[in-house]
A protein has these predicted regions:
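Structural motif corresponding to the early beta-alpha repeats
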Residues: 1-9, 30-33
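Short linear sequence motifs
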Residues: 5, 16-19, 151, 155
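Beta/alpha (TIM)-barrel catalytic core signal, keyed to glycine-rich beta->alpha loops juxtaposed to Asp/Glu
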Residues: 31-171
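CE4/NodB-like, metal-dependent polysaccharide N-deacetylase domain
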Residues: 8-27, 54-59
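Short, conserved acidic/polar surface loops in the N-terminal third of protein domains
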Residues: 5-10, 38-42
Length: 171
C-alpha cells in the first residue's frame, strides 16, 4: 500500500464526503499490530498523519481517536506507551470469555490487553464477543450448565454479557 501523506489525507477527507458528516465521533486507526512497528511508523508517524489526526481532534473534527489491535503484542505495548503524548481515547480489542485467558494463534489474552488499557483509563471497544459465532454454538454439556443457572437466557447472551461487563468497555 501507499502510505504517503497525500494518499492518507485524501482518504481522510473522502471519509467526510462519503459519510456526509462534519466530524467523527470515533476515528479508528485500523489493524495496528500486523507488520510490526515498521508498518505503524510508515502509516502514521513518518508521513506525519498521527500529528495531523491529533490536530484534527483538537479542532473537533475527531471527537475520540483510537485504534484496533490485531497481532503482535509488542506493537500493542509500544503503541499503548504513546498514550502519555497521544492520549488515546479508546482501543478496540478482541475480548470474549475464551480469549480472556486462553487465546490461541495470533490472539493475545484479553485479560492482559484490557488490564493494560485499564491501567491508563482507556476505554475498550470490543470485537469478536462471540469468537466468530463459536460461542453461540457450544457443546450440549456446556449449554446444559448455562441453562441450569439462567434457563431463559440464550447461549450467546452469556458471551455478550461477559464482553460487556468490564467497567471500561464502551457500551
Amino acid at each position: 500500500s501507499n502510505f504517503s501523506r497525500e494518499n492518507s489525507l485524501a482518504m481522510y477527507h473522502q471519509s467526510f464526503k462519503d459519510m456526509q458528516v462534519e466530524y467523527f465521533d470515533y476515528y479508528l486507526l485500523h489493524a495496528i499490530g500486523g507488520g510490526g512497528m515498521k508498518v505503524f511508523n510508515e502509516r502514521y508517524i513518518d508521513n506525519g498523519m498521527l500529528d495531523f489526526l491529533l490536530k484534527e481532534r483538537e479542532a473537533g473534527r475527531i471527537r475520540h481517536l483510537g485504534w484496533s489491535f490485531h497481532g503482535d503484542v509488542e506493537v500493542f505495548d509500544q503503541v499503548l506507551a504513546m498514550h502519555d503524548t497521544v492520549k488515546w481515547d479508546f482501543v478496540q480489542i478482541q475480548l470474549n470469555y475464551v480469549d480472556w485467558r486462553h487465546a490461541t494463534g495470533n490472539n493475545v489474552n484479553a485479560e492482559y490487553l484490557y488490564g493494560e488499557l485499564a491501567k491508563r483509563n482507556i476505554a475498550a471497544v470490543i470485537m469478536e464477543p462471540l469468537l466468530g459465532g463459536r460461542l453461540s454454538n457450544v457443546p450440549e454439556h456446556i449449554v446444559g450448565r448455562l441453562k441450569q443457572r439462567r434457563p431463559e437466557d440464550s447461549v450467546a447472551s452469556w458471551a455478550f454479557r461477559f464482553a460487556g461487563s468490564p467497567e471500561l468497555v464502551l457500551t
